[in-house]
Each structure stands twice: as C-alpha cells, then as structure tokens.
C-alpha cells in the first residue's frame, strides 16, 4: 500500500481517535493527544460527509466535555486546527475552545 504523507497523517488521526473512543467508553479519562485526535477525526469525517466549515467549527466543540479529560487538559487545548478535504477542496478548520 503506497500512501502519501497526507494520507498517513489522516490514517494516524483515525487510529488515535479509535483508541481514544475505546478508552473513553471504558471510563478512562482522555489525555492531550487523545482529545486532539477525537476532535480532529470529527472534523475530518464531517468534511468528508459534506458539512460546512462553520458547522464543523461548532460541531468540533461538542465532541468532548471537560469531565471526559484528565485534569488540566481542557485548559491546555485552546484551539485545534485541522486541514480537512471538502467537496470543493482542502480547507483549514479552526475549533476555538474545543473542550467545554
């Protein structure tokens, strides 16, 4: 399988998000990389589904609650930027204060 660096990054995000989902389902609090992966995956998949940038900026902030994360993680992550592929091209999506 020959993947471009961009495709490898997308695959890594998807895998990390899957690990984070399993841990959250077991009641384990998420760490920084897991929280970022879940938010990023939600944005990338939403773009693939054809959702708008504005919609994903809002939806990305609803993926994780502060109580799902280890202490201090919500305050540490002030924004998440994800480059996602939309039907009309690649765009940078910024989710401000993603963990509330």
Swiss-Prot record:
Catalytic activity, reaction form: urea + 2 H2O + H(+) = hydrogencarbonate + 2 NH4(+)
Broadest EC class assigned to this enzyme: hydrolase
Subcellular location: Cytoplasm
EC number: 3.5.1.5
Keyword terms of this UniProt record: Cytoplasm, Hydrolase
Signal peptide span: none
Matching Pfam families: Urease_gamma
Pathway recorded for this protein: Nitrogen metabolism; urea degradation; CO(2) and NH(3) from urea (urease route): step 1/1
Record GO biological process: urea catabolic process
InterPro entries listed in its UniProt record: Urease_gamma, Urease_gamma/gamma-beta_su, Urease_gamma_sf, Urease_subunit
Alphabetized GO MF terms: nickel cation binding; urease activity
This protein's record includes keyword Cytoplasm: yes
Record-level GO cellular component terms: cytoplasm
Membership in a protein family: Belongs to the urease gamma subunit family.
Complex and partners: Heterotrimer of UreA (gamma), UreB (beta) and UreC (alpha) subunits. Three heterotrimers associate to form the active enzyme.
Alphabetical list of NCBIfam families matching this protein: PRK13241.1, urease_gam
Name assigned to this protein: Urease subunit gamma
Organism of provenance: Ruegeria pomeroyi (strain ATCC 700808 / DSM 15171 / DSS-3) (Silicibacter pomeroyi)
Chain's gene name: ureA
């Amino acid at each position: 399988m020959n993947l471009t660096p961009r495709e490898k990054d997308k695959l890594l995000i998807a895998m990390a998000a899957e690990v984070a989902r399993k841990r959250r389902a077991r009641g384990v609090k998420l760490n920084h990389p897991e929280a970022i992966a879940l938010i990023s995956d939600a944005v990338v998949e939403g773009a693939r589904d054809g959702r708008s940038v504005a919609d994903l900026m809002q939806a990305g902030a609803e993926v994780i609650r502060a109580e799902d994360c280890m202490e201090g993680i919500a305050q540490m992550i002030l924004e998440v930027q994800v480059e996602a592929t939309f039907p009309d091209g690649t765009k940078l999506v910024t989710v401000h204060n993603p963990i509330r």
